Design a protein with these regions (language model features):
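Phosphate/dinucleotide-binding and metal-coordinating scaffold of catalytic cores
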Residues: 1-312, 316-440
Length: 440
């Protein structure tokens, strides 16, 4: 039976096996179970002896891969993978995955961290960033057979290594430092056309605003190569060692992996976890008070900026030695406000991915949400009312200045329509806060 060995940095963790019937099983290595660095690969795959055969095995590894069937088909075509199943795809592109996971054939070992790369010229960088237009997945251009990465999510993206001011393609098992996101483009729906051609600018703006309001988000910058404009987001699952000679992978997983769920149920409306389940889970965090506070604060932020994609795969935890965990920075934040009007969507169509408590059922429609719904949710969750009031009051006080500060920090060629659309609607919803909490 074919096997893939799972590594965390240079530590052998266990073996992923694909059975004859297509099922996936996982077994922790004895030396990993005995190691002082031992931690579960996933909180849905607790440390234990023997084979783990639950659905959580398939779902954990499947969630390391891009969501899009189109991108998966490109991987099959590019590397002649046997199928679209996780084992077969990760056999080809599992060298640098989300978190600390590296998957290698049985005959390959990692005795020490290796750092090797190829510096990219601007022309080569543009080639990597436009590879998807030629049906090449994740920027893995044909001339670079050694460049094999897996980046989860639905958006066109790749990952690259930043050395000083240079963008580089990593060689072998060398990690990447940044996720590189391309413009999403147009999404055609039955009743609307969503123009996300400015998604790079949109996400950059949202990350700046989140940081200005005290939320923990990764650093990001807009990069250009030829005619390509992309967003480079610093990976929080990577860290240089003290000497800055070796890049370490940090174990983490998203909430679908944590709960052993497939990505098909990442939305609460499809049966995935909502605020209550995640808040209950964060009670067990090594920084429970902070994480629960920050998570509730982020729910308010998503409402204010019209972020409709806050599903389970867009929240993650770091997995620490022994299996303790804590919340990672927030990520993948885009406002839907620039999509309003024209052939786009109406404000009444915008809904949060996770519902808030209301007098009757759940409230998801962004334009129908008021501060009272956050307070009602906090009450159901037994989240301290005084802290929820504090969060709402802080946003009421901070929003106007934060918007001004972000606007003055933007590059001169930043699209004004993105700023106007987000700012106008944020201030409109902010009015609901300021009426109750005051704002000067």
């Amino acid at each position: 039976m074919p096997k893939l060995v799972t590594w965390m940095n240079n530590q052998r963790v266990g073996e992923l096996t694909k059975l004859a019937n297509g099922a996936h099983t996982f077994k922790y290595a004895p030396e990993w179970l005995a190691s002082r660095y031992a931690r579960p690969l996933s909180l849905s795959l607790p440390l234990q002896r023997g084979n783990i055969t639950s659905d959580a095995v398939f779902n954990f590894f499947d969630n390391l891969l891009p969501d899009s069937p189109i991108v998966r088909d490109r991987i099959v075509k590019r590397y002649h993978a046997k199928s679209r199943q996780p084992f077969d795809l990760l056999s080809e592109i599992g060298r640098d995955s989300v978190g600390a996971v590296t998957l290698l054939p049985e005959n390959e070992t990692i005795t020490r961290p290796i750092m090797a790369w190829e510096k990219l010229t601007e022309a080569r960088l543009e080639e990597v960033l436009t590879a998807y237009k030629a049906d090449i997945p994740l920027g893995m251009i044909r001339e670079e057979n050694d460049f094999r990465i897996s980046v989860a999510g639905a958006q066109e993206k790749t990952a690259l290594l930043r050395i000083g001011n240079d963008w580089c393609i990593p060689k072998g098992i060398t990690p990447t430092t940044h996720i590189i996101k391309l413009p999403i483009g147009e999404i055609r729906q039955p009743n609307a056309t969503l123009d996300l051609s400015q998604s790079v600018d949109n996400e950059y703006y949202c990350l700046l605003l989140a940081k200005e309001l005290g939320l923990n988000v990764p650093d990001a910058e807009i990069i250009k190569a030829g005619n390509v404009r992309a967003l480079a987001v610093e990976r929080f699952d990577r860290r240089w060692n003290a000497e800055r000679t070796v890049l370490l992978r940090l174990p983490q997983e998203d909430m679908c992996q944590t709960f052993g769920l497939p990505s098909s149920v990442k939305y609460e409306s499809d049966g995935g976890p909502g605020i209550a389940r995640i808040m209950a889970f964060l009670m067990g965090s090594s920084e429970a008070l902070k994480d629960r506070y920050d998570f509730m604060k982020f729910q308010v932020f998503q409402w204010l900026i019209g972020a409709t994609d806050g599903h389970a795969k867009n929240f993650s935890v770091f997995i620490q030695a022994g299996g303790s965990y804590r919340l990672t920075p927030f990520y993948d934040i885009i406002s839907a406000f620039p999509l309003l009007g024209g052939t786009g969507i109406h404000i009444s169509d915008l809904k949060l991915a996770m519902g808030l408590n209301a007098s009757k059922g759940k409230k998801t429609a962004i334009d129908k949400i008021y501060p009272r719904h956050f307070l009602a949710t906090a009450k159901v969750l037994r989240f301290p009312e005084v802290q929820m009031h504090e969060i709402l009051s802080d946003f009421a006080r901070m929003i106007p200045a934060a918007l001004d500060n972000v606007k003055t920090s933007l590059p001169t060629d930043f699209p004004e329509n993105v700023v106007t659309a987000v700012e106008t609607n944020v201030l409109r919803l902010h009015g609901r806060l300021s009426r109750e909490y005051g704002s000067k």
